[in-house]
Amino acid sequence: MIVQRTAAPTGSVPPDRHAARPFIPRMIRTFAVPIILGWLVTIAVLNVTVPQLETVGQIQAVSMSPDAAPSMISMKHIGKVFEEGDSDSAAMIVLEGQRPLGDAAHAFYDQMIGRLQADTTHVQSLQDFWGDPLTATGAQSSDGKAAYVQVKLAGNQGESLANESVEAVKTIVERLAPPPGVKVYVTGSAALVADQQQAGDRSLQVIEAVTFTVIIVMLLLVYRSIITSAIMLTMVVLGLLATRGGVAFLGFHRIIGLSTFATNLLVVLAIAAATDYAIFLIGRYQEARGLGQDRESAYYTMFGGTAHVVLGSGLTIAGATFCLSFTRLPYFQTLGVPLAIGMVIVVAAALTLGPAIIAVTSRFGKLLEPKRMARVRGWRKVGAAIVRWPGPILVGAVALALVGLLTLPGYRTNYNDRNYLPADLPANEGYAAAERHFSQARMNPEVLMVESDHDMRNSADFLVINKIAKAIFAVEGISRVQAITRPDGKPIEHTSIPFLISMQGTSQKLTEKYNQDLTARMLEQVNDIQSNIDQMERMHSLTQQMADVTHEMVIQMTGMVVDVEELRNHIADFDDFFRPIRSYFYWEKHCYDIPVCWSLRSVFDTLDGIDVMTEDINNLLPLMQRLDTLMPQLTAMMPEMIQTMKSMKAQMLSMHSTQEGLQDQMAAMQEDSAAMGEAFDASRNDDSFYLPPEVFDNPDFQRGLEQFLSPDGHAVRFIISHEGDPMSQAGIARIAKIKTAAKEAIKGTPLEGSAIYLGGTAAMFKDLSDGNTYDLMIAGISALCLIFIIMLITTRSVVAAAVIVGTVVLSLGASFGLSVLIWQHILGIELHWLVLAMAVIILLAVGADYNLLLVARLKEEIHAGINTGIIRAMGGSGSVVTAAGLVFAFTMMSFAVSELTVMAQVGTTIGMGLLFDTLIVRSFMTPSIAALLGKWFWWPQVVRQRPVPQPWPSPASARTFALV
């Protein structure tokens, strides 16, 4: 007897309705109602006993600051050394006036500073530059219409305490009445993060509404049944409520931390995954019902065909997201545990609550009955085309992938969070106000600190400090460096050596007129000397004449002495003869009364005087002779005296000329020195910077020391501003150059070997960039390994698992390239730096789901032969997987309505990746690879290229196939 044999038909064969019932689905079906009630009670308890997820996220918000980053360590250490606080949270308060800020604005500012300093709970310290005349210009705009103060807040950035501190500062500012025409803004990184969280929480409700709208529309389009869509929505809503409640419960009790990114992604991911799993379950149930199985058999077929896929998919997503916990950046680290726990809850609900709802609702009439036959014919044609032309189809799919892959080299990221937040956020408005008067970098400076082992408050170390500031300022792209040697960003006036030298001539300048007057008096002295010379020459002439006269007088007197003696002798003779008569005149008592008597007596008395005169003349003659001897000597001395006075006159004239020349020269030198000092000041040239020791005792300068030097003087800090955006790639690239410049500047100086700390905006984002690369590598590799292991366990094929992972990676590159094309090149918005890591991890996990479902279905149908199995798998899973993929993709794209552009970018990137994975990779690439590899696709399993020959099916079976 000859038995006719043929290959198996391409339609799926319904399983035996009397097959064994596995324990788990049987228990779920048996206790479906208690399971549903248990879930409802659990959901009610979780959502009633603790606040909603958004509220818990605000209460238990964790810091987004990477504590292990060098910049963060530096900022905290700088705060500790300067005794300004130990947090990394800072805010800027900006004052903006319609006119230059005056005394009223200063009074308001002082009042505000006092209120802030009084709030020690929320404010740790202030950098009051505007309140100090020495540093005021550094905190005020060039037009005088704006000023700012930096406030160090309590709590690390992103934490609930930091957000509370931001609100406290806003409250203080709002309670004060600024002067007319002056507006006050609270901005800065801490305020921006707090506003970002509020915007994210506001957006979450809108996202949920849009997401459910998208899901309802998609389900109605796919199933054309309000009841079926309502049942699926019930499953999704219950799964979402369970996930929200569970994560909120854990967060409320401080078991896990939350962030605005975690809550946003968790909600949308839970909705999308719950919808996908509901589609998998109901789709497979309706497929089984369409093949003629009864409700119970269809239930078990559904569970047996999808449970392992849902479990594998959920574990893949949970495991991949949990890999984010291995990262170092809190932005990613805080996503790991909440998303993983949320996905575990979604999977648990999908594998217990979902089948229980299907088991209950399937007993009531035709609630879950398919309204139309599944569209398998079109997908079978796709499968047949793939089996027939696997190579060209694979090439076409790869060509489509190249559209995105070729865009990747032009990928540029952006680290400025402001660009991805609404412009009307208070912090963004504050930044905008500041940028109207300051450069963008002034609000986002870098802070470099050099810490030595000794007190640097001395002239020698200040030379090194200025050298460091100059070296940093010389770095390309640096526009401003504030330090103790340049408090307002410019060198301190009058601190150059040329100016100090010019100042030393100030006293000479003050005595210049006095010295000139003294020099002028020398001419008067010369005139006096000349007068004396003239008198001396006249005196010399007279003295010469006197000498001659004296000599003649001596000669004459010598003769006169002889004559007088001779006269005396003759008178003596006369007296001797007339002595008797003379005696009469003397004894006559009345001689006085007798005129003749008294007259003759007087004559005789006169004759007696001749002796005295002779004696006197004899005594005078030696004197005259001596005078005659001295007068020539005196006359001889006079020319020498005149010559001496003439020499004095000449010397005085020479001295006058010399002094006058010196004074003119010193005046000219003083003018050159002053001009040189003024030139060095005007040019702001500090090549010869020097501060004398007495400056350190100046009270104003000591206030400046408090701003830039630590209390013990062992550390000095520099405030550095970039020329452009510090959060750009160019700004980030300068960080290494700044460190190198500071290190090179202290070589060979007393500060050599000092510790250098650098923090700030660009330094932080450099660490984030480096950490992002590291975290992406760690999370990506760990996620790929985990996905490969799960795929390997599910498919039990090394090649199939490798193909799934490889196609997912290819899909990831293509989809991210498409996102770059749309956002960067079409919309003109660079992708935020968070997008790559978030999208990669989620796409790695979710993208593998649809390939897993296809390969799992292919594994079920492989007994019919590889090519037939591909056709059957494509026909059986095509519509379900496509519907699930589209729902998941558009659900993620609902992030586009978020106020946070970064979440819109993450959502659209994931959505485009899922569309590409669903429509290209799962539909064409993976099955074409399976067709090309043939039996090697299932290695190390042994499969047949063709099925084992079997008898022709019975007429009943043929009719069944015909229905399909």
UniProtKB/Swiss-Prot annotation:
Family annotation (PANTHER family): MEMBRANE PROTEIN MJ1562-RELATED (PTHR33406), MEMBRANE PROTEIN YDGH-RELATED (PTHR33406:SF6)
Transmembrane segments: 31-51, 203-223, 230-250, 255-275, 302-322, 340-360, 389-409, 773-793, 803-823, 826-846, 880-900, 923-943
Keywords: Cell inner membrane, Cell membrane, Membrane, Transmembrane, Transmembrane helix, Transport
Membrane topology category: Multi-pass membrane protein
Localization per Swiss-Prot or TrEMBL: Cell inner membrane
Origin species: Mycobacterium tuberculosis (strain CDC 1551 / Oshkosh)
The protein's name: Siderophore exporter MmpL5
Family, as annotated: Belongs to the resistance-nodulation-cell division (RND) (TC 2.A.6) family. MmpL subfamily.
Lineage, broadest ranks: Bacteria, Bacillati, Actinomycetota, Actinomycetes, Mycobacteriales
Cellular compartments per GO CC: plasma membrane
Self-association and partners: Interacts with MmpS5.
UniProt-listed Pfam families: MMPL (PF03176)
Biological function: Part of an export system, which is required for biosynthesis and secretion of siderophores.
Gene3D superfamilies tied to this protein: Multidrug efflux transporter AcrB transmembrane domain
Disulfide pairings: none
